[in-house]
């Protein structure tokens, strides 16, 4: 039996990376591999983590072996964990890379693993160049990439960034598979009842944690456009703020949007994800910059049309006029796309959405 260890966040850590890694582990098990996950005992020091907590309140995933060993800021730990993983002598290590801060820790662990002369190391690169730049980013990234044998990216934008650092090693571009582990889709009426939302309102959804690059401020300004107000559209914001909330509330107050912006500004646990996606008419990703987004495969799974901006890999994932609408990253364009969506109607997008969804399997 072939063996693999997935290195990256996993339960009890929360968030999209942990969810993806656990789903990937389940797929390896289904396909007959021996699979374990190697996660963090300390992922981010509290000073560097912008949210309220790094830990999940959901039940532990079943049938997964998870080792919470990596301390991201302790070099002695990196060598110890690397030695532990080297001695396991697994056939394959799949490691996630999403932020240069993790480069020294993960790179050192992998450097130790390579000493066994057997284990192949494949990196799933979520980001190579971060959304928010810091000194040392390129050095940390180069150090990490040097320890990997091959790479997988989930957008052309990340592939291009990777090739700026690593021009010769094998790299494969694949689609971000569906998040199909949040439970079955439910009727919109049931989802709205759970969230105490009106069954008849027009509701657009912004889903996920809030940072500047995600453009929630642009979407709020779009909500203030007269054409959007005339269309009686409401915005449901579901996610924790990873930066100061004040500028967003200032926009809401300035444009008198309080009755039309429904703020659920807390982390959405896995057990509630289906309710939010199924309650919405459309999912909006008004990003200023993007490589790919975990929200997109989530919308595909729950068969929700999308409005995305024409940045990074988003237009490749959301064919314009078929599974949703693509617009420029400014308030006027986003507002026009919202109105166009409701004038067109969600049903117009459903046949294409279901066809495109088939391309996003785990096989």
Language model feature labels by segment:
Residues 275-291, 304:
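Acidic donor-binding loop of glycosyltransferase active sites
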Residues 320-332, 339-346:
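Conserved acidic donor-binding segment of nucleotide-sugar-dependent glycosyltransferases
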Residues 246-267, 271-274:
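Nucleotide-activated donor-binding/catalytic signature segment of Leloir-type glycosyltransferases, i.e.
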Residues 8-14, 26-87, 158, 163, ...:
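N-terminal strand-loop element at the rim of the active site
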Residues 347-363:
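A charged, aromatic-enriched C-terminal amphipathic alpha-helix characteristic of glycosyltransferases
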Residues 40-44, 234-249, 266:
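Glycosyltransferase donor-sugar binding loop
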Residues 134-135, 163-164, 172, 177-194:
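Acidic anion/phosphate-binding donor-loop and adjacent secondary structure
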């Amino acid at each position: 039996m072939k063996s693999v260890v997935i290195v990256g966040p996993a339960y009890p850590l929360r968030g999209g990376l942990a969810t993806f890694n656990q789903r990937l582990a389940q797929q390896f098990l289904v396909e007959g591999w021996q699979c374990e996950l190697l996660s963090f005992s300390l992922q981010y020091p509290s000073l560097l983590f912008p949210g309220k907590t790094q830990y999940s309140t959901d039940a532990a995933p079943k049938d997964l072996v998870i080792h919470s060993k990596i301390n991201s800021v302790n070099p002695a730990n990196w060598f110890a964990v690397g030695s532990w993983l080297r001695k396991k002598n697994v056939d394959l290590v799949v490691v996630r890379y999403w932020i240069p801060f993790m480069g020294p820790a993960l790179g050192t662990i992998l450097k130790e693993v390579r000493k066994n002369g057997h284990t192949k190391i494949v990196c799933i690169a979520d980001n190579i160049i971060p959304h928010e730049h810091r000194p040392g980013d390129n050095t940390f990234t180069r150090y990490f990439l040097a320890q990997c044998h091959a790479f997988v990216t989930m957008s052309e934008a990340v592939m291009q960034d990777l090739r700026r650092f690593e021009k010769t090693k094998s790299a494969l571009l694949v689609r971000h598979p569906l998040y199909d582990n949040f439970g079955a889709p439910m009727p919109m009426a049931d989802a709205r009842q759970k969230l105490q939302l009106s069954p008849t309102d027009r509701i657009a959804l912004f889903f996920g944690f809030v940072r500047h690059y995600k453009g929630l401020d642009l979407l709020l300004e779009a909500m203030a456009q007269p054409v959007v107000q005339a269309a009686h559209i409401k915005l449901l914001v579901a996610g924790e703020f990873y930066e100061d909330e004040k500028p967003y509330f200032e926009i809401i107050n300035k444009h008198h949007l309080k009755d039309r912006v429904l703020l659920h500004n807390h982390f959405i646990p896995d057990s509630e994800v289906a309710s939010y996606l199924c309650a919405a008419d459309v999912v909006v990703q008004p990003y200023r910059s993007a490589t790919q987004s975990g929200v997109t495969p989530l919308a595909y799974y729950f068969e929700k049309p999308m409005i995305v901006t024409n940045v990074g890999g988003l237009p490749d994932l959301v064919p314009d006029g078929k599974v949703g609408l693509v617009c420029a990253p400014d308030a006027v364009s986003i507002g026009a796309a919202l109105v166009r969506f409701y004038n067109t109607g969600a049903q117009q997008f459903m046949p294409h959405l279901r066809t495109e969804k088939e391309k996003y399997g785990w096989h």
